[in-house]
Amino acid sequence: GVRLVGSEMCIRDRYDRVAFNSLEEGTSLTVQNNLRRFGMAEVSRHLAFIKEDIPTLKIRLRRHKSFNIVIIDSFQYTQMTYRDYIQLKEEFPDKLFVFISHARGKNPKGDAATSVMYDADLKIWVEGYVAFSKGRYQGATGEYTIWEKGAYDYWNVAGPKQKGGQA
């Protein structure tokens, strides 16, 4: 799901390149195969897979014409504190950072990740191939289907779940 969101960011804004900082999976063959599997080859010149710790990423982002959108997988693998996050955000105010987090239920795992969630302008929880907005920028429905067939199978075939965590 995250890779498709990265692809969507590349497609929607042809002028920005997206860095997917895959600390958890790295730039392995698995990641490359997923890129092909999800049809992201068409945006590959706008999407770069990297595996860099935060100090190295900061060096990259200080360069002229660096990435304007950075997806970080995952917040826990950065080993950042909330203070580290604030420093990153303040040093690069014109960059969009998307943090993927391990979860405990529908919330990020760990105090620092939870604090980042509360600071974020937009919070997105993904379940069953559907992304749900938890923030104030929800659009018409507050949800975005990432993969139609997967979402159909999960929500309609797998049992009586309620979309969006509604009971």
What kind of region is each of these model predictions?
Residues 1-6, 10-11:
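Single conserved hydrophobic/aromatic residue that forms the stacking wall/gate
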Residues 5-6, 66, 119:
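Alpha-helix C-terminal capping/helix-to-coil transition sites in glycosyltransferase folds
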Residues 14-95, 128-129:
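Conserved inter-motif catalytic segment of the P-loop NTP-binding fold
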Residues 90-167:
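Phosphate-binding/switch region of NTP-binding enzymes
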